[in-house]
C-alpha cells in the first residue's frame, strides 16, 4: 500500500473490517406493486400477452393500501440490499393518490425515489392488452401527470423526490398519449420512462398496428 494517512475526525466511526464497502446501488426500473404477486409462477408460454392477461386479472383489484404496502416492503428490501436510489413505474391507477402514497412511503424510509407516473389508455375494446375498465382517459392522465410534477418534483441537486412520466407500452397506450406525455415532460423538465420491444409479441403488435 501507499502512505498511511490518518483518517479525518468524525462524529461516528464504523468498523467495516471484513466488509465490502460500495456506493449506494441504483435501481433504475421496477414495478413495486408486483411484489404482491411475485410468489406466483403461472405458465404463460413465454408470451408477454399471456403474461399481461394472467396478471391483470389480479392487479385489477389493487387499491391504495396494496400499493402503499407493496411500496414499503419493496423499498425496505432494496434499502437492506444496499440500494439508496430507486425508480418505480406505476402504470395502474384504479383511483387517484397512489403515486402520492408512494412518495410518502419513500420519504419515510429515506430512499432517493423517482416515481414514474405511468399510464394505460388503450384497452381491449380498441385492440390493446389493457382490460376494459383499467384504461384511463387521455385528458385525466395529462392532468394528473402535471399535478404530480408540480406537487412533488424536486429540482435541487441531490433531490430526494422526483417525478418522471411514462406510458406503459405501445400495447396498452395510444400514440397520442405518448406524444402528449413527451411534450408535457419536455415542458415541465422531467424525464420520460417506458418499455420498448419487451418481446416478440410487442414487436408484432406494433408492426401490425402502426
Predicted region positions:
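Histidine-rich, glycine-flanked metal-binding segment
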Residues: 1-22, 165
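Short, ordered loop/turn segments at secondary-structure junctions
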Residues: 3, 37, 91, 118-119, ...
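N-terminal capping/lid subdomain adjacent to the active-site entrance of alpha/beta enzymes
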Residues: 21-25, 30-32, 58, 79, ...
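Proline-centered helix-kink/hinge sites
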Residues: 23, 60-64, 167
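Histidine-centered catalytic micro-motifs
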Residues: 23-35, 191-200
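Alpha-helical scaffold segments that flank or form the walls of functional sites
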Residues: 38-112, 142-158
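Metal-coordinating catalytic core of metallo-dependent amide/deamination hydrolases
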Residues: 97-210
Amino acid at each position: 500500500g501507499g502512505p498511511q494517512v490518518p483518517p479525518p475526525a468524525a462524529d461516528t466511526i464504523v468498523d467495516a473490517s471484513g466488509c465490502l464497502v460500495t456506493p449506494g446501488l441504483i435501481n433504475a426500473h421496477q414495478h413495486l406493486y408486483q411484489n404482491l404477486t411475485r410468489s406466483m409462477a403461472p405458465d404463460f408460454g413465454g408470451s408477454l400477452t399471456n403474461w399481461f392477461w394472467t396478471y391483470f386479472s389480479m392487479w385489477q383489484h389493487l387499491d391504495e393500501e396494496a400499493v402503499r404496502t407493496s411500496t414499503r416492503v419493496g423499498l425496505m428490501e432494496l434499502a437492506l440490499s444496499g440500494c439508496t436510489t430507486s425508480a418505480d413505474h406505476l402504470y395502474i391507477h384504479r383511483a387517484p393518490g397512489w403515486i402520492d402514497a408512494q412518495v410518502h412511503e419513500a420519504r419515510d424510509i429515506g430512499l432517493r425515489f423517482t416515481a414514474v407516473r405511468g399510464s394505460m389508455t388503450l384497452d381491449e375494446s380498441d385492440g390493446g392488452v389493457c382490460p376494459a375498465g383499467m384504461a384511463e382517459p387521455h385528458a385525466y392522465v395529462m392532468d394528473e401527470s402535471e399535478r404530480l410534477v408540480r406537487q412533488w418534483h424536486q429540482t435541487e441537486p441531490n433531490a430526494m423526490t422526483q417525478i418522471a412520466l411514462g406510458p406503459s407500452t405501445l400495447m396498452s397506450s395510444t400514440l397520442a398519449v405518448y406524444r402528449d406525455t413527451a411534450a408535457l415532460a419536455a415542458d415541465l423538465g422531467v424525464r420520460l420512462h417506458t418499455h420498448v420491444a419487451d418481446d416478440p409479441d410487442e414487436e408484432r403488435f406494433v408492426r401490425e398496428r402502426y
